[in-house]
A protein has these predicted regions:
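Fe(II)/2-oxoglutarate oxygenase catalytic core
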Residues: 1-158, 166-187
Length: 187
């Protein structure tokens, strides 16, 4: 077992080709985008923060392929990288959520202890967060953890980390271009 929190943040390179990333971004052009809102479970309220990105849960023609890529990354993280005898399975993972960060948008610091996505047929609290990047042609938009460790996720890469209070993270403002990412949560 590792003793540093950063040891449980894993970047998996080359899970998508550049051409597939570009194809997915084109597919996203027709999706129904909405401004991201934070849901506060204790209060039962949702709030805009002011400079939030847009997101969509719409399926694209590549959604099934993306789910397979996410599954392989989860498998690598749980069964190959860490391989703990007491942690060998999970219930499932969410369909990809896409985020689109235009210039001057950001994601405030938070942890992925999400309740609202797992209250229907799928029940649970996320145990792992999966973030994949679809492009590099933007500036800014760095993911920050611990509180000053910078992760620049390249197009085609996935970053996986535990979804709990020990892993607060934020996305710095995009200063040029548009940043496209997808997210999934393992429960």
């Amino acid at each position: 077992m590792k003793d540093k929190l950063q040891d449980y943040v894993l970047t998996i390179p080359n899970v998508l080709t550049d051409s597939l990333c570009e194809k997915i971004i084109k597919e996203l052009e027709v999706c129904n985008w909405k401004t991201h809102i934070f849901y506060y479970h204790r209060e039962g309220t949702s709030k805009l923060q002011g400079k939030d990105p847009e997101n969509t849960f719409d399926k694209t023609p590549s959604s099934q392929l993306l789910q397979e890529v996410v599954w392989k990354a989860i498998h690598k993280y749980i069964l190959e990288e860490f391989n703990f005898p007491w942690f060998e399975s999970w219930e499932g993972f969410s369909l990809p959520k896409f985020n689109r960060y235009h210039e001057n948008t950001l994601m405030k610091e938070h942890c992925d202890h999400i309740h609202s996505q797992f209250e229907g047929k799928r029940r649970g609290i996320p145990i792992l967060s999966v973030i994949g990047s679809l492009n590099n042609n933007y500036e800014g938009g760095e993911l920050i953890m611990f509180p000053d460790k910078e992760y620049k996720i390249k197009a085609g890469e996935i970053l996986i980390f535990p979804s709990n209070f020990l892993y607060p993270h934020k996305v710095m403002p995009v200063t040029k271009g548009t940043r496209y990412t997808y997210l999934s949560w393992v429960y």
